[in-house]
Amino acid sequence: MSDEKSKATLLKEEIMMKGSKGAATLNAEEIKKADDFCVGYKKFLDHSPVEREAVSYTLELAKKAGFTEYDENASYNAGDKVYYVNRDKAIALAVIGKNGVKNGARLAIAHIDSPRIDLKPNPLYEDTNLALFKTHYYGGLKKYQWTALPLSLHGTVVKLDGTKVNITWGDDENESCFCVTDLLPHLAKDQVSKPLAKVFTGEDLNVLVGSRPYEDGNDEKDLVKLNVMAILNKKYGIVEGDFLSAELCLIPSFKTRDIGFDASMIGGYGHDDKVCAYPAVMASLDVETPEQTCVTYLTDKEETGSDGNTGMQSDFLRYFIYDLAKQDGIDGYKALSKSTCLSADVSAAYDPTYASAYEAKNSCYINEGVVISKYTGHGGKYDTSDASAEYMGKVRALLEKNNVMWQVGELGKVDMGGGGTIAKYVANMNVDVVDLGVPVLCMHAPFEIVSKIDVYMAYRAFFAFFDDKI
């Protein structure tokens, strides 16, 4: 048999895509780098379950790396590193480039909020000798996934005198936690006959927080509620009225864990979108003197539409770029118009158990690198930014040049559902933008799963974006 390749084989090698670039193509050294990188990521995830804590932890990392607080009246030089915090719930990290923002900035934008259960403004009540919290769920979650689950309380309370109190209760395995109760199967005939979306309503997500009455209560009412409030008062110095000026939420109380016999994956709460936030932050910390100013921005409120003054629809980032442009002697809108952005957000990894929800040829897969999504939205490409072919080509070439493992993918089958990212709000500022992130299994569940290799490739992608010329 001849060893010469046929014309068809040669043509195929020249013009056809090569297929998967999965984990099998990486050597042991690269896999170890991925595993080592994820040690820091797992710590970040455990310390950053809610946006205020994510900002605090990011700020700690940034200061250790030499970042200083941004001063609009200061003069900055290439290589200077600054941070800019928005109301303790969003943060920008900027590394000043050799050309500043004269030719635009490089933006990597991730969000640090995740689906959770928020407390209502007046949450604490007692019913049949049980103390409970009334809640209002946040973001697109499946309510049934949050029942019969150990929960922790996180957040901030501002007292009447203006004192700010940070609360964390339930993370330590030796500390008590909280729970949304569920109905036993023996009495669930009516419950299980309902459509899944109607099994639990928002008003059913009441959180059990106590059952013992306050001692020496005599004939007073609501002694269990009083006892809970007395415990909170003793530990934090707060009174019931302080709930009215508080941001408190309940999140899963379990820690991040490796998944699989091979420990190749990570399970935990809040991968969406901290699995993109952390690699982008680390890229900012590691880049030294880029050509263009590089900005990693961690924003809030993405899960509920990016509204509010800490969400992507606020003008905080726009004004920051304007201030940087002012120092360079150009108009802010011109700097933005020349900027490029990676919208650092996750996508839904193909799950063979639920294959009917995906279109296999245009899905992303675990262990095949970062995923580029040209558009998200729903139906006929509604509510999305659709990245241009030109910008897709530039990002594709950048990743290939820097040997970053990558893939493309859509969010499931057309008309199956859909979702959105902050990309459309960035595009509205006349910035070229495309979504680039990590594939996730069990997205929006209390326990999401990602690949360590994909997390590391996200870091490689963001670093290349900051450090290389496009």
Predicted regions located by residue number:
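N-terminal hydrophobic/helix-forming segments and targeting peptides
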Residues: 1-470
